[in-house]
Design a protein with these regions (language model features):
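A short acidic/small-residue loop/turn micro-motif
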Residues: 31-34, 87-88, 155-158
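Short beta-strand segments
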Residues: 7, 65-69, 107, 131-137, ...
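Glycine/small-residue-rich loop that forms an oxyanion/phosphate-binding "nest" at active or ligand-binding sites
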Residues: 105, 111
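A charged helix-plus-loop insertion that forms the helical arch/lid used to bind
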Residues: 77-88
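ATP-binding/phosphotransfer module of carbohydrate and carboxylate kinases, centering on a glycine-rich
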Residues: 1-63, 73-76, 94-102, 116-126, ...
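Short glycine/serine/threonine-rich phosphate/pyrophosphate-binding segments
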Residues: 13, 112-115, 137-139
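Short, charged low-complexity linear segments at domain edges
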Residues: 142-158
């Protein structure tokens, strides 16, 4: 039996046919429309196209799994609110079921990515894992015993909104001091720009050709590798914030594995070694406690499709 995985993003909707081993047989991409009725119709058309091109009969499809950004109630099959898409109470399960006649399940996009990496990716072979996705904010997913744990009404698993600083920086969620204000890719860029303005002789200026608007998540890291003192300080401080965010979750769940994804994860072992060392030194239980394995996500842009399909694992 095959499964359909649908990864809804702010810019595009990726749909794929996935086999029982988590391999994508074929996939397609369409632009995300802000009209939810159009989105559903486009997904239905993409599924029909994939079935036709692969010679797959609809009777061979176990179900459609959907990953979507925002607040998702998996039990009700509803995207309650997606701020990036300005969607409210999007009944995706009911809508897709009506169009296709197939069973449909939905979960938050970060949750399905975590599920994909646990079942088929970086943490394959581990039952319990937590994934942190470092981007505009900090997405996260928790997998316990091979299944997504999303809390009551599917509203939990938000590591980006644990508090690092009481009365700290104002977060877009309305609270202050949230982790994503310090450990997201957006925060890293902000910290990098601040350090550059305070250190006019920093190699970080060379990396961006003197244009501070070209700063991205690589600027401080690549300059740090060349020994630039200001960049080293930015990276070490950022890794401290990220490590403390991870520790907050480790000390509650103590998973078998931690997965780091998103743009910043492209730094690979350079990032991972710093975070691993910090967490092993400062976690509850110190050297006597069992260590959670740490990995960089490996499925990339396919994690959303694979994880969504795995809702029918």
């Amino acid at each position: 039996m095959y499964r359909i995985g649908v990864d809804i993003g702010g810019m595009s909707v990726k749909t794929g046919i996935v086999d029982e081993n988590g391999a994508i047989i074929k996939k397609t991409v369409t632009k995300t429309d802000r009209n939810t009725d159009v989105v559903l119709e486009n997904i239905k058309n993409d599924i029909d196209k994939l079935l036709s091109e692969t010679g797959t009969d609809i009777s061979e499809i176990k179900g459609i799994g959907v990953g979507c950004p925002g607040s998702v109630d998996s039990e009700k099959g509803e995207v309650i609110y997606s701020n990036n898409l300005d969607w409210w109470h999007f009944l995706v399960v009911k809508g897709l079921n009506a169009l296709t006649g197939l069973k449909v399940r939905v979960s938050n996009d970060a949750n399905v990515a975590a599920l994909a990496e646990t079942l088929y990716g970086a943490a394959k072979g581990y039952k319990d894992a937590i994934m942190f996705t470092l981007g505009t904010g900090i997405g996260g997913g928790i997998v316990i015993d091979g299944k997504i744990y999303a809390g009551g009404h599917s509203q939990g698993a938000e590591p980006g909104h644990v508090t690092l600083f009481v009365n700290g920086e104002k977060c877009s969620c309305g609270r202050r001091g949230c982790a994503e204000m310090y450990a997201s890719a957006t925060a890293l860029i902000k910290q990098t720009k601040k350090a550059m303005l305070e250190n006019k002789d920093s190699k970080m200026w060379d990396f961006v050709g003197g244009d501070i608007e070209k700063v991205d998540g690589r600027t401080a890291f690549e300059s740090s590798k060349k020994g630039d003192p200001a960049a080293v300080k930015v990276v070490d401080t950022y890794c401290m914030y990220l490590s403390e965010t991870i520790l907050n979750m480790l000390n509650i769940f103590r998973p078998d594995a931690v997965i780091i994804g998103g743009g910043v994860s492209a730094q690979g072992d350079y990032l991972l070694d710093k975070v691993r060392a910090y967490c092993e030194k400062d976690h509850y239980g110190y050297i006597l406690a069992p260590k959670s394995k740490m990995f960089i996500a490996k499925l990339g842009n396919d994690a959303g499709i694979i994880g969504a399909a795995a809702l029918f694992e």
